[in-house]
Amino acid sequence: MKLAEALLQRSDAQRRVDQLRDRVTANARYQEGEEPTEDAGELLAQAVETLATLESLVVRINLTNARTTLPGGDTMTAALARRETLRATHALLVTASDAARGASGGYRQLRSELRMFSALPVAELRDRADVVARELRELDVEIQKTNWEAELQN
């Protein structure tokens, strides 16, 4: 199985656990004289079984990420950490740029009101955000490509 397929299965398992949790909660109690819509015990057993499958998948995915290298020589684990850092950096730069340009609505209605000035270079921040966004897209393409090429480890 390819790493990408395992990632899809992990996502499906996580979604299934969430759905089962909701169904268990909805059927954990019922009113006297009525029957629950579903057997909460059976739903709970299914959720526990799905969690065991999920745990096995996560272990194999993490092993694969640690052992798989991207074309640039970094491990998948390092590339994933880099991607998260790039995402956080991009969000920070965009937020700072928006705040510096007054995107939150700091305008003057009267000439007697105080003028607001930007403490940060908006154009430079936007340029840096664009560069980071490009790096992020390129790295994400490498990661996705490798996900479909790498075999899932045991």
Q: Residue ranges of each PLM-predicted region?
A:
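Structural preference for solvent-exposed beta-strand-turn elements
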Residues: M1-N154
